[in-house]
């Protein structure tokens, strides 16, 4: 069975068997609303996942319970998603020193720029190698990037690694922050 055509499974890629390329999924991984047991290696996909498949945004689960926006056990515990988008550790590297948490804290320390972590849904973060639930940057992402990559434009097929369509965050209306 062929890989998914334009979807994104795992971060940055997923291949455990079958015919998979750098930006496609394990066979059948994208065909239902549940992850396959080995879709993205053990750190990414669990045998089943929540229908909306968000990890760390706005909530998550490591105990097996799911609500509308959480993941299955261990999905948020390793490299896929950090334990929480609002924790200061394990969120990749950025520019400068220091850190800010939340939806857009800015700061600086003299001439040294401050690293900011911007939380967003767990869609693909283009141009980075960071876990999708965090963006570390010296400049704030747009409100569109932060708040409008939602289930309506993500394929909810991957536990902790929901897949954005390529134009997911490109055509939404920019809200006023």
Swiss-Prot record:
Pfam family, one: Keratin_B2
Entry's Gene Ontology cellular component terms: cytosol; keratin filament
Domain of life: Eukaryota
Signal sequence, renumbered to the chain: none
Transmembrane segments: none
Swiss-Prot/TrEMBL keywords: Keratin, Repeat
Record carries keyword Repeat: yes
Tissue: Expressed in the middle/upper portions of the hair cortex, in the region termed the keratogenous zone.
Keyword Transcription: no
Family (UniProt): Belongs to the KRTAP type 1 family.
Quaternary data: Interacts with hair keratins.
Name of this protein: Keratin-associated protein 1-1
UniProt gene name: KRTAP1-1
